[in-house]
Swiss-Prot record:
Part of the 50S ribosomal subunit. Forms a bridge to the 30S subunit in the 70S ribosome. HAMAP family: Ribosomal_uL2_B (MF_01320_B). Disulfide bonds: none annotated. PROSITE patterns: RIBOSOMAL_L2. It comes from Janthinobacterium sp. (strain Marseille) (Minibacterium massiliensis). Coiled coil: none annotated. One of its GO terms (molecular function) is structural constituent of ribosome. GO terms for cellular component: large ribosomal subunit. This is Large ribosomal subunit protein uL2. Pfam families: Ribosomal_L2 (PF00181), Ribosomal_L2_C (PF03947). The keyword Lipoprotein does not apply. Residues 224-275 are annotated as: Disordered. GO terms for biological process: cytoplasmic translation.
């Protein structure tokens, strides 16, 4: 995997940096693990915009990812590493000894031909999935469950990883990349190692059109709107907002706490620090 700076043959390519991975499979994805994915353009069933800046983009299929990894004791072999347009991480197509194929998140250093295993008897090896109670303290993990059997929810993005800090009774403490420390049940499953494609954060899109291919529409600043459209709008000439930054609906938009899930607050040992 390498970072390639594109020659400035046009304004859109000036400054563009691509992530090139020669090991990615160049054919079509495995048809048995594809599902239809329809566009919403950010609208709900009434046609009202519920999420701004979404629309257009290339047609995509959803790749069904196995986030539960419950085929215990059956060895699997990595057939190929693929690009997935639905996430920043790459995915791996694995073939189990019983003939079933599944997509999983590709770990750092994973290559075609690697042997993987799920379950409590699996060795501590990058790409293997097992309960946290069987993973040594200090191990870097990803695809961590928050509830036993629910499937991986934490550390699924490119380059992500959490560190197993301690085990106490039926719970373990894991440190997330944000610095937050959470309690997780020891029966929750996690995959050993970091998520691959960490260079994804170093790429530079280069032009607005590349974001339109991804289905992202422009974001217009509130200060250039009219007062009817945004609280920051209006004024003669170029003027400041005249107030603390707010959303188009008047809610504070920088730094306001939005978390309201009190049910799981007890699972947070320490909140993330300010950057």
């Amino acid at each position: 995997m390498a970072l390639v700076k594109v020659k400035p043959t046009s304004p859109g390519r000036r400054g563009m940096v691509k992530v090139v991975n020669a090991d990615l499979y160049k054919g079509r994805p495995f048809a048995g693990l594809l599902e239809k994915k329809s566009k919403t353009a950010g609208r709900n069933n009434n046609g009202h915009i519920t999420t701004r800046h979404i629309g257009g983009g290339h047609k995509q299929h959803y790749r069904v990812i196995d986030f539960k990894r419950t085929k215990d004791g059956i060895p699997a072999k990595v057939e190929r590493i693929e690009y997935d347009p639905n996430r920043t991480a790459n995915i791996a197509l694995v073939l189990y000894a019983d003939g079933e194929r599944q997509y999983i998140i590709a770990t750092k250093g994973m290559a075609v031909g690697d042997q993987l295993m799920n379950g409590s008897e699996a060795p501590i090896k990058s790409g293997n999935c097992l309960p946290i109670r069987n993973i040594p303290v200090g191990t870097v993990m990803h695809c961590v469950e928050m509830l036993p059997g629910k499937g991986a929810q934490m550390a699924r993005t490119a380059g992500a990883g959490v560190v197993l800090m301690a085990r106490e009774g039926t719970y373990a403490q894991v440190r997330l990349r944000s610095g937050e420390v959470r309690r997780v049940h020891i029966e929750c499953r996690a995959t050993v190692g970091e998520v691959g494609n960490a260079e994804h954060s170093l790429r530079k899109i280069g032009k607005a059109g590349a974001m339109r291919w991804r289905g992202v529409r422009p974001t217009v600043r509130g200060v250039v709107m009219n007062p009817v459209d945004h609280p920051h709008g209006g004024g003669e000439g170029k003027t400041a907002a005249g107030r603390h930054p707010v959303s188009p609906w008047g809610q504070q938009t920088k730094g306001k706490k939005t978390r309201s899930n009190k049910r799981t607050t007890s699972m947070i040992v320490s909140r993330r620090g300010k950057k």
